[in-house]
Amino acid sequence: MLHLDRLLIRQGDFTLRADATACAGERIAVIGPSGGGKSTLLMAIAGFLAPAEGRILWQGRDLGPLGPGERQVSLLFQDQNLFPHLTLRENLGLGISPALRLAAGDRARIAEALERVGLAGLGEAKPGRLSGGQQGRAALARALLRARPILLLDEPFAALGPALKAEMLALVSEIAAETGATVLMVTHDPEDARRFAHRTILVADGRAEAPQPTAALFADPPPALRAYLGP
C-alpha cells in the first residue's frame, strides 16, 4: 500500500497538500489543471522533492530517508528519457546496471522485455530511428526491467495520437496486471482516466484529494473539476 500521510510539499510560494492511499496493484489517474501540482506530487513520491511535512509510506515503510534510486519507484516522463547516442539495448541496460555491466542473463532479460512491448529485433536501433510510439514502448520496457512495485507515469504518451495512446495505455494495464505494480498516471484527458483507472485523484487549489471512483467523479464532478473540464 502507498500512503501519503498528511503530506505538505512546498516549492517557493506554491504549496500542495495530500492525504491519500493507493492499494497494491491499483491503477489511479491523477487529473487537474496545468500548474496544479500533479507532476509535483509524482516527483515527491519518487524522492526528487522532499516534503515539508508528512510522510510517504510504502507497505508501512517511511520512504523519507531514501533517495530516488533507493525507492521502489519507476518514473516515466513525457520525453521518455532515452539517450540518443545509445542503442535500445543499452538504454534498457541502464535499468539493470548504470555502468552497463551486463551478463548474459541480463541481455536475455532485455531481449524478453523488448519482445514483451512489441520491439523484438530492435535492440541495436537508436532512439532517433523510432516513432514516438516505439520510444514510449522502449521507456516502458526499461521500467519493466527495473521491476519496481510503484510505477509513476507523468503523461508519457501525451504526444501520441488517440489510437497509439489507447494502445500504450492498454499495454501498461496488461503489464501492471502481470506484475502487480501500483500505477499513478498523470493525465489531462478524462477519457484516459476512464479507460485506465478505477479511481482518480483530483489535484487542484493546492490539494491532491483522496482518490474517488473514476466513473462517479466524472458523473458528478466537484466545482474544481467542473471548472477544469469546462461546459
UniProtKB/Swiss-Prot annotation:
Q: Which SMART domains does this chain map to?
A: AAA
- Catalysed conversion reaction: thiamine(out) + ATP + H2O = thiamine(in) + ADP + phosphate + H(+)
Q: Where in the cell is it found?
A: Cell inner membrane
Q: Which GO terms describe its molecular function?
A: ABC-type thiamine transporter activity; ATP binding; ATP hydrolysis activity
Give the enzyme's EC designation.
Answer: 7.6.2.15
Its membrane topology is listed as:
Peripheral membrane protein
Read off the Pfam families from this record: ABC_tran
- Tell me its family: Belongs to the ABC transporter superfamily. Thiamine importer (TC 3.A.1.19.1) family.
Question: What is the name attached to this protein's record?
Answer: Thiamine import ATP-binding protein ThiQ
Upper taxonomic lineage? Bacteria, Pseudomonadati, Pseudomonadota, Alphaproteobacteria, Rhodobacterales
